[in-house]
Amino acid sequence: MEKEATKMVNGGVKSKSPKGSPDFLGYNLRYVKLGYIYLLSLSRTFCFFLPPLLLLFIFVSRFLPILAFPLSTFFILLIYHYLTPSSVFLLDFSCYRPPDHLKITKSDFIELAMKSGNFNETAIELQRKVLDQSGIGEESYMPRVVFKPGHRVNLRDGREEAAMVIFGAIDELLAATKINVKHIKILVLNCGVLNTTPSLSAMVINHYKLRHNTESYNLGGMGCSAGVIAIDLAKDLLNAHQGSYALVVSTEIVSFTWYSGNDVALLPPNCFFRMGAAAVMLSSRRIDRWRAKYQLMQLVRTHKGMEDTSYKSIELREDRDGKQGLYVSRDVMEVGRHALKANIATLGRLEPSFEHICVLASSKKVLDDIHKDLKLTEENMEASRRTLERFGNTSSSSIWYELAYLEHKAKMKRGDRVWQIGFGSGFKCNSVVWKALKNIDPPRHNNPWNL
C-alpha cells in the first residue's frame, strides 16, 4: 500500500488497464443515463437553432461574402460550446464558527461531565485519557445541553443545534456569493445521525423560502465521508440540469451523537465530535468560471460494506439501559487502510501531483497513521492537524474547515490541486480533487479562521 499510495501523492498512480483499451467495467450505469439525457437535450437544441442559422449563413455567403469568414468562426465556436459538457465549479464555501460562549477546554469538559452525574468514575477517567490523546485543543465548541443531569438525546435539542449551525453557514455563504435563493435549483444536505421529519433539507427550504421545484435531497446515516457523497450527488444533478446552482450543506449534530451512559465502548466519540457545519455553492453555468474559486476535477467513492468487518466497524448502538451511542471497533484503523488503498487505486493517474491535502480530522492517531502510510510531509498534514486542534472532529464538514485554513494562510494559488479525503461508516473512503482557478486571497468575512 505504501508504495502505491506514495506514487499517487507524488506523481499519480498509473492506470492498470491495458494501454489504449478503455475500462468499460469501471463505468457506472448512472453515467450512461446522464449521457442519454445530455444527448437528447443537445439534439433538441440543434433541431431548434441549426436550420435558421444555416439559412442565415447561406444568405450572408451569397449577399455579404465579406462577413462569411467571421460568421463561420462564430458558428464553429457556438458548436464547440454546445458539444463540450460544462464543468462543475465551486463558487465559494463557508464554515460556521459557533459563538465564543460555546467554547470548551478539556478541563471544562471533564468538570461538566462530572457535575452532570451521568458518568461513573471509570467513564470519567476514560474520557479524560481519550481527551488528552485526541489532538483537540482548548477552543473547540460543544452545546452545553449535553451536560445537563439526566440528559437524554431528544429531537428538540437536535433541531435547535441543527438550525444554529446550518443557517449560520448558509447565511455567510449567501452573503459572500450574493446569489438569490430563488436561483438555487438543487439542495443536498447530509447529516449522519440526526434524521428528522420533516427532513433537515426541508427545514432549509422552509427557512429560506426556496422555489417549489427545488431538487432537494437529505442524506442520513452515511457517516463522516458523506460530505463528498453530497458533492457527488450535486455534481450529477448539475450535469442533468445545465446552467444551475447547487447548495450543498454538511454537518453533524453533537447533541444527537452524545452518549450519556457508562459503556466504555460507546464513550470515545464523546471526546472527538464538536459543533460545526459547512455550506458550499456549486454551479454548472459556464459564465461562472470567471468568478469561481475551484473546478471539480475528479471524485472517487469507495465502499467496503461487502466485508462484515468493515460494515460493523462503526455503528450506532444502544446500551443495556437503552441509551444510544456510537461504537467504533478496534479494527477501524485497518479497515480504513484497505478502503484508502482501494480509493487510491481507483483514483487513477493524476498529474501534476497534489499541492495540498485535506484529510478528515477525526483524531490524532488517524492523522498520524495516514501521515506515515502515505509518506506525507508535515506541510501536507498542517491543515488537518490545525483543524483538529482548533475545531475538533466536525465530521463531514471537517475537510472544508481544512480548505478554509489553506485559504486563510494564502496557500491556494492558481492551478493548485487540493485532494479532500473523508472516511465514514459503512465502511467508506471518498475523495474529491479540486483545481484552483485563481490565486485565492484570504477571505475577510466568511472564514472561520479569521480572528
Curated annotation (Swiss-Prot):
The membrane topology of this protein is: Multi-pass membrane protein
Q: Name one GO cellular component term.
A: membrane
Keywords annotated in UniProt = Acyltransferase, Membrane, Transferase, Transmembrane, Transmembrane helix
- Give the reactions, separated by semicolons, that this protein catalyses: a very-long-chain acyl-CoA + malonyl-CoA + H(+) = a very-long-chain 3-oxoacyl-CoA + CO2 + CoA
Question: Among the record's GO biological process terms, what is one?
Answer: fatty acid biosynthetic process
Which tissues is this protein detected in according to the database? Answer: Expressed in flowers.
Q: Which domain of life is it from?
A: Eukaryota
Active site location: 224, 303, 356, 393
A Pfam match is ACP_syn_III_C
Which family is this sequence assigned to? Belongs to the thiolase-like superfamily. Chalcone/stilbene synthases family.
Q: What is this protein called?
A: 3-ketoacyl-CoA synthase 15
- Gene name? KCS15
